[in-house]
A protein has these predicted regions:
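Structural signature of hydrophobic alpha-helical transmembrane segments
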Residues: 1-10, 30-33
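Short aromatic-rich membrane-water interface segments that cap or initiate transmembrane helices
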Residues: 1-6, 125-139
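Hydrophobic cores of alpha-helical transmembrane segments in multi-pass inner/ER membrane proteins
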Residues: 7-20, 63-77, 136-152
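Hydrophobic alpha-helical membrane-insertion segments
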Residues: 19, 92-107
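Membrane-interfacial loop-to-transmembrane alpha-helix junctions, especially the N-terminal start
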Residues: 26-37, 92-98
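Membrane-proximal helix-loop-helix units in multi-pass membrane proteins
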Residues: 36-90
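C-terminal ends of transmembrane alpha-helices
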Residues: 42-52, 103-122
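C-terminal transmembrane-bundle signature of multipass membrane proteins
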Residues: 106-119, 133-162
């Protein structure tokens, strides 16, 4: 569906932004590897229909591999990683990213519960309404995460440009 294509495109952009930052800027490399790896695992999960062509549920193994690969260098350099993560939590973009993740991982799941809709609408339950609200909440969360990633990218580049003068 169009909604899923947009969500997958947004996730791809988020992954690209964080891996680009990790590749170009050593100052926050391990933090960006972790964030990019997390969103890569989420992207793989969103692409589950594609991975089901290989074998049903195979997305799990690809997501696990992506997560493990994203953990290697940050774990090896754990002190730098912790310092970078602490720095990231002090940016305004961290709060926006967390808000987006809450919308995706918590609220969209709550709004997607059939029992909730049956309790609210009783006999007037229509599945399409539940799907629209659930996917809308998820899309909103992805857009918050993309906005946070773009904002972080721009702020990070400006900060480095100022330090180079």
């Amino acid at each position: 569906s169009l909604t899923e294509i947009v969500q997958e495109s947004v996730l791809t952009a988020i992954v690209f932004i964080h891996f680009l930052l990790a590749w170009r800027y050593k100052a926050m490399r391990y933090c960006n590897i972790l964030v990019g790896g997390f969103f890569l695992a989420m992207l793989i999960r969103e692409l589950d229909a594609l991975f089901d062509l290989i074998a049903h549920g195979s997305w799990v193994w690809f997501a696990l591999i992506a997560a493990l690969l994203a953990l290697i260098h940050p774990v090896i350099h754990y002190r730098q990683t912790l310092h970078q993560l602490a720095q990231y939590t002090r940016t305004p973009w961290y709060g926006l990213l967390i808000s987006g993740l809450l919308a995706i991982l918590v609220f969209s799941r709550l709004f997607g519960m059939q029992a909730l809709w049956l309790a609210i609408l009783d006999g007037g339950y229509v599945r399409v309404v539940k799907n629209v609200v659930e996917e809308g909440c998820e899309s909103f969360g992805y857009m918050l995460c993309l906005t946070a990633s773009i904002g972080y990218f721009c702020t990070f580049r400006e900060t480095l440009a100022q330090k180079s003068y």
